[in-house]
């Protein structure tokens, strides 16, 4: 514990307004509004399958992270003698493992797996390390929280990405539903309302994926370009942008409505 406190004190000792702003931006980059908007753009506008893979990894990792937090119940460093934490209003719940770190690791590892480009590897690595370090700089997590957030994020993202590829290729919806079993069993271990909410998020994605894949089958830019001839008189780019904008606005509005309803039912 002394080593962890000393690490946090080191970050505390180098604080200045410029670094405060820098690390604050990094930590905000992985919070719900930003992640939701970026993922929604990927899913509804750019490439549906990439978006689904990203969503599966994110929802599963968030559920796992919340479950571990509620099981371990590790206190945060906030309030520890000699430490001054910043932006504590968003550092709610238990400490281990770091939710921001695991979410950032999941998001950027997923994009690295999807795109497999050098620039994405570099950007992803910078963001993964940066978000984790921002949690230490702000003094809202112990080093062990961040380290395990990195490890869990990488391991589970690789696992769920491969699982999604198998499910999507073979249309094995039963296998996808079976992944919920260990999550459901864990409800009786942690008995946590927060975990149940996150499990609901994962369940919602799985059911939504099955319904969309079997019945709706909307197109994103990749499928749209395949179906529309570029020699057509229709301005395909303009037509697609308008459809994507409508879909994005409607989707965000629906998500906001669901969020408000859920928070009203389970405040």
Residue ranges and their predicted role:
Residues 25-36:
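The first (N-terminal) embedded transmembrane alpha-helix
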Residues 22-23, 38-39, 44, 52, ...:
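Membrane-embedded catalytic cores of phosphoryl/pyrophosphoryl-handling enzymes
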Residues 1-21:
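Short, strongly hydrophobic alpha-helical membrane anchors
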């Amino acid at each position: 514990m002394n080593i962890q406190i000393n690490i946090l004190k080191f970050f505390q000792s180098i604080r200045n307004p410029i670094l405060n702003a820098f690390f604050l931006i990094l930590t905000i980059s992985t919070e719900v509004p930003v992640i939701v908007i970026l993922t929604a753009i990927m899913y509804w506008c750019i490439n549906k399958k990439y978006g689904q893979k990203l969503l599966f990894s994110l929802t599963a990792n968030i559920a796992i992270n919340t479950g571990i937090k509620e099981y371990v119940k590790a206190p945060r460093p906030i309030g520890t003698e000699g430490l001054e934490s910043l932006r504590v209003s968003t550092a709610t719940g238990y400490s281990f493992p770091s939710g921001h770190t695991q979410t950032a690791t999941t998001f950027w590892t997923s994009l690295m797996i999807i795109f497999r480009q050098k620039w994405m590897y570099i950007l992803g690595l910078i963001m993964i390390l940066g978000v984790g370090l921002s949690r230490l700089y702000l003094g809202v997590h112990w080093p062990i929280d961040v380290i395990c957030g990195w490890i869990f994020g990488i391991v589970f993202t690789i696992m769920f990405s491969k699982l999604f590829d198998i499910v999507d290729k073979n249309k094995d919806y039963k296998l996808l539903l079976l992944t919920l079993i260990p999550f459901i069993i864990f409800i009786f271990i942690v008995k946590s309302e927060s975990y149940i909410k996150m499990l609901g998020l994962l369940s919602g994605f799985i059911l939504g994926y099955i319904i969309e894949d079997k019945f709706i089958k909307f197109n994103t830019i990749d499928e749209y370009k395949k179906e529309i001839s570029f020699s057509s008189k229709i301005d395909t780019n303009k037509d697609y942008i308008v459809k994507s904008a409508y879909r994005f606005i409607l989707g965000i509005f629906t998500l906001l409505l669901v969020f408000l309803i859920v928070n009203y039912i389970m405040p």
